[in-house]
């Protein structure tokens, strides 16, 4: 077990001033036991904590660091912006056009785009736009899918809500809950039933095409196509939440991978290169309803600020120019195969789901295709696995219901180290 004296001291101090001592619930280590680790520095595929311990990082700031931490091109670009341009103006800037052009070029569904400050803002704004354009009130989401902490989405949510065993949050009004309908992931019949029961009053269907906050659960292609067809028939806006899987599973996101185009797309994480950013975009006919062009209001003091846009533009250019996706696939497949071999040697049969460089090892033998199957996992067993990996210098998300992210800077030696650690951790978990 690494020495964590300073982390423990900081956590005690943090709890005096910050609710729970953290600024996002999943960071608190509640589902794995122990105290959270305070980090001091990130570099490439590694993080170093305040006690001087170094970890191989498979969280990647919860997804943004597909190119690793402190990428030299991104940090150099940020330094130029900071010293020669500034941090914010509250006016239009040329970089807003540059990133918009890149997003229109890269993402199949996007004809126009609006920058915001987070993935939550993006999903909230997209749903408001869908309601404004259709004149309808209700939305359909899917059990276990996480779309940020907007009130409409905290009904059988994933991510920290699932980790804490609290799928509904106090403070969400009954009216909001009544306008949010939950369907079962990968089950088109459950969606069709809700649409039939609420005929003419469904504004949008929002989905993570690769769910990343109930572990990792890919949608079946025929399911996404059925959603597309249903939305076309019923005049419903189809929203792909690609905050996590966008630019991760393919340059153009899951919609490129599946070949299915939504009406609106929400983005975040990778397009900020580690800085706070989000975006929503889609069909011109919908986006032209956003203020000031249309009547659907959305605004943000720091939206499109130079630092976030610099990191996003540079990240997208690197991904576009260098195409790391074949190599990311090779690396993630190596880990998947290594974990599978380890389980076979130990007589274990846990489930692995993976799409590109997003993966999850589920501590269940039930195939995981939905929220219901995900929650069959043995979370105590995962806790033992997590602790053993941490003891060996491998930093995973402190929750069974989060993704493991492989980055472009994980080396072959890093991957081999991870597979060896996995064998030991599986032994510890199965005791």
Swiss-Prot record:
Pathway assigned to this chain's UniProt record: Porphyrin-containing compound metabolism; protoporphyrin-IX biosynthesis; 5-aminolevulinate from L-glutamyl-tRNA(Glu): step 2/2; Porphyrin-containing compound metabolism; chlorophyll biosynthesis
Domain of life the protein comes from: Bacteria
Q: What is its EC number?
A: 5.4.3.8
For the keyword Signal, the answer is no
Chief subcellular location: cytoplasm
Record-stated family: Belongs to the class-III pyridoxal-phosphate-dependent aminotransferase family. HemL subfamily.
Protein known as: Glutamate-1-semialdehyde 2,1-aminomutase
Cite the source lineage.
Answer: Bacteria, Pseudomonadati, Chlorobiota, Chlorobiia, Chlorobiales
Name of the gene this protein is made from:
hemL
């Amino acid at each position: 077990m690494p020495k964590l004296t300073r982390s423990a001291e900081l956590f005690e101090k943090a709890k005096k001033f910050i609710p729970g001592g953290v600024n996002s619930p999943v960071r608190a280590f509640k589902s794995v036991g122990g105290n959270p680790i305070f980090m001091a520095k990130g570099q490439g595929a590694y993080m170093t904590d305040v006690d001087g311990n170094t970890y191989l990082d498979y969280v990647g700031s919860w997804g943004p660091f597909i190119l690793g931490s402190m990428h030299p091109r991104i940090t150099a670009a940020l330094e130029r912006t900071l010293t020669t341009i500034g941090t914010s103006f509250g006016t239009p800037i040329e970089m807003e056009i540059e990133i918009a052009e890149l997003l229109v070029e890269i993402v199949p569904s996007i004809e126009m785009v609006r920058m915001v400050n987070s993935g939550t803002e993006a999903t909230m704004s997209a749903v408001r736009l869908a309601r404004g354009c259709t004149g309808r009130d209700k939305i359909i989401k899917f059990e276990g899918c996480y779309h940020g902490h907007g009130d409409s989405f905290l009904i059988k949510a994933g991510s920290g809500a699932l980790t804490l065993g609290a799928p509904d949050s106090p403070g969400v009004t009954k009216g909001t809950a009544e306008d949010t309908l939950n369907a079962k992931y990968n089950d088109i019949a459950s969606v069709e039933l809700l649409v039939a029961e609420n005929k003419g009053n469904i504004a949008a269907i929002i989905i993570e095409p690769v769910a990343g906050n109930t572990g990792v659960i890919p949608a079946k292609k025929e399911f996404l196509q059925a959603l597309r067809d249903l939305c076309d028939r019923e005049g419903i806006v189809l929203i792909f939440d690609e905050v996590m899987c966008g630019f991760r599973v393919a340059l153009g996101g899951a919609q490129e991978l599946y070949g299915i185009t939504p009406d609106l797309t929400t983005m975040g994480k990778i397009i900020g290169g580690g800085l706070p950013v989000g975006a929503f975009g889609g069909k011109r006919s919908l986006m032209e309803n956003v203020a000031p062009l249309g009547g659907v209001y959305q605004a943000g003091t720091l939206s499109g600020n130079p630092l976030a846009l610099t990191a996003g533009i540079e990240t997208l250019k690197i991904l576009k120019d260098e195409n790391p996706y074949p190599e990311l696939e090779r690396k993630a497949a190596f880990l998947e195969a290594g974990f599978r071999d380890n389980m076979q040697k130990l007589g274990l049969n846990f489930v692995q789901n993976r799409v590109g460089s997003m993966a999850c090892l589920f501590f269940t033998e039930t195939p995981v295709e939905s929220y219901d199957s995900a929650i069959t996992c043995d979370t105590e067993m995962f806790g033992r696995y997590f602790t053993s990996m941490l003891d060996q210098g491998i930093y995973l998300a402190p929750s069974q219901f989060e993704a493991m992210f492989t980055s472009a800077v994980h080396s072959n030696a890093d991957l081999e180290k991870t597979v060896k650690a996995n064998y030991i951790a599986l032994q510890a978990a199965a005791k």
